[in-house]
Amino acid sequence: MKAFRIAILVLVLLMAVSLVNSAYLTRRCDEWTTRLNAVTDAAGSGDWDTARQTVAALDNDWQAKQSYLHMTLQHEEINTADTLLQQCVLFVDIQDIDSLFDAALQLSLQWDHLAEMEQLSIKNVL
């Protein structure tokens, strides 16, 4: 009976950690998307200096979270998001608004996908 209780406790702890991870990652992805929207808003209004500063801060924050992300997510998914973010940085540097909007949209969708992958759902369990 004691072994059964330990197994149940371990299962409950794993589920709790999974829920905390999901909530954290969802919050981070939402924050990154909000900051990315600020980049595209600034670029759209012609304020490239603000766009450059905002995307640089976003990139620094993204890079600071890489260790955690690599422990909790699939590497190819992180690499896709990283590539898209670097494209956004480049497009801000060369002031290519159309390409920036395209890359930002893809990156926003990728961050939504990353958050969705960690949510506790039947789709993710099966």
Regions found by a protein language model. Give the residues of each.
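C-terminal-biased regions
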Residues: M1-D41, R52-L126
